[in-house]
Amino acid sequence: MGDYKAEIEQVYAGLTDQPPHTEEQKVMAKKIIELHLATFKYYDYKRTFELVDENYRQHSQMVADGRDSIIEASKVLKSIAAKNWKGPGEPHFNMMFKRILVDGDYIVAQIFSERWPGDAGEHVFDLYRWKNGKVVEHWDVIQQVDAAKMKHGNSVA
């Protein structure tokens, strides 16, 4: 694991509005947090390869099958973040995990993602299939947030 173990624990501790996890579910939830941090914040692609199965199946319309595809997606997102990046660190989306639900081999992560400071953001649901300690499959739904069109004062996440 990279130097972000404390950050994984901090993110996990911030998940308060959800059912409790068993010990096995905690491990799975923390691995999903680690996957997101390694791939989309710290660009630790060696760790990404360790967490994602070589036969990874993708259902997002923007990403291909195979674990190389998740790295290509990371590079695209980094280039988007870099357009308005003000630091510190490397450009990345600010991902705020709201909930992680685990049921059997499935893990659902609800995330609010800001592409740059001041961005209205994106509301993301990621669904992963977990097998033998690795992510083997992924689905997602991404909703662009438009604060001007909100018909209520609640957050989307």
Where are these regions (language model features)?
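C-terminal and inter-domain tail/linker signature
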Residues: M1-A157
